[in-house]
UniProtKB/Swiss-Prot annotation:
Stated name of the protein: L-rhamnose isomerase
Function description: Catalyzes the interconversion of L-rhamnose and L-rhamnulose.
GO process terms (BP): L-lyxose metabolic process; rhamnose catabolic process
Keyword Transferase included in the entry's annotation: no
Pathway: Carbohydrate degradation; L-rhamnose degradation; glycerone phosphate from L-rhamnose: step 1/3
Domain of life: Bacteria
Amino acid sequence: MTTITQKYEEAKEKYASIDVDTEAVLEKMADVKISMHVWQGDDVRGFLSEDELSGGISVTGNYPGVARSPQQLRQDLEKAFSLIPGKHKLNLHAIYLDTEERVDLNELEPKHFEPWVTWAKENGLGLDFNPTFFSHPMYRDGFTLAHPNPQVRDFWIEHGKRSRRIAEYFGRELGQVAVNNFWVPDGFKDNPVDRLTPRKRLMASLDEIFSEEIDPAYTVDAMESKLFGIGSEAYTVGSHEFYMGYGLTRNKLICLDAGHFHPTEVISNKLSSLSLFGEGMLLHVSRPVRWDSDHVVIMDDELQEIAKELVRNDLLGKTHVGLDFFDATINRVAAWVIGTRNTQKALMKAMLEPTNVLKEAELIGDFTTRLALTEELKDFPFADIWNYYCQENHVPIGLDWLTDVQEYEKVILPTRQLPTGKDSCRFS
């Protein structure tokens, strides 16, 4: 018996004393798929064009070794997934096409993503998708689907339609439902006079996109709101209220991004209410630092509260958990590993709570037991369960994964040269 296994057996007994079955927790963890986002790997560049980022998005940093091709990106992704327990999904944006053809966003077809599907099959992964409504010449005056010019709207409507066909292709080929998430940056920098008309245009554009029947067995649509962005500080067309109304009346998933609300708001407090009314939920787990900064996810209070809400209320079955952060100041493979493993840790920690005992205490008004038990749980040997889970999934335990990443950085990343005059420091 290894030391890891021995510690697990001891921890198993400890948790059994409070009616927690660690074996059942490990089985549940095996069913949790995290949708890891591709754009951390290349600073949201993609392979459609060399245009700079726009749409209120910024990436800072110039850490060496950034992926410059789909092949390099997949190489980095394979390294990251090899250090993360379980089988998961990869979340693609439309700008991550892999083709020799020169095509625009309104011309994309499933064939332009065939290499990704082949790779996903080889690695036992699912794929999710996102139409890309930013960093493009047709992103005009801060608007896309809500632009007053019908020609601009038509371009983006066609892109939205094609994205749904691509997502359906992913689901059909891989046997896993592909979530297709819609986020548009449309908005005004300064105070508008007319807040209603742009929202009418956005609603009409979305209705046109979704007019085509797509098999929900293969793909489902999600709608993502945002409080503000760079260049849309005063008004965002796709607000939380807009997409709550739209999603609930059109049977779409509602996407909650941890950084897309006021700094004093938390999405953990929204999950229970939304679960009562919606078809389902998509989460973009992120870490906002004073604004939607998309820092790498850490094991902070809000991440743990999100996990508790999902587990305590049995919401994992109707919630798709995705990540959304990008940091070019650190090793990009390490960023993926840290963020994904932390999200898994938070979910496991929530599963190791005696939820039924706590709910019963709360129901009868025994708040003393509720407080005492939740506090004592903080000293329980959660790490021993996590380490055993990693051991059983044949991935590094503790900081051992960092040694792998550092070796990868020494051997692989130096072979990648930045184009002359370019770096990874991008602002918009």
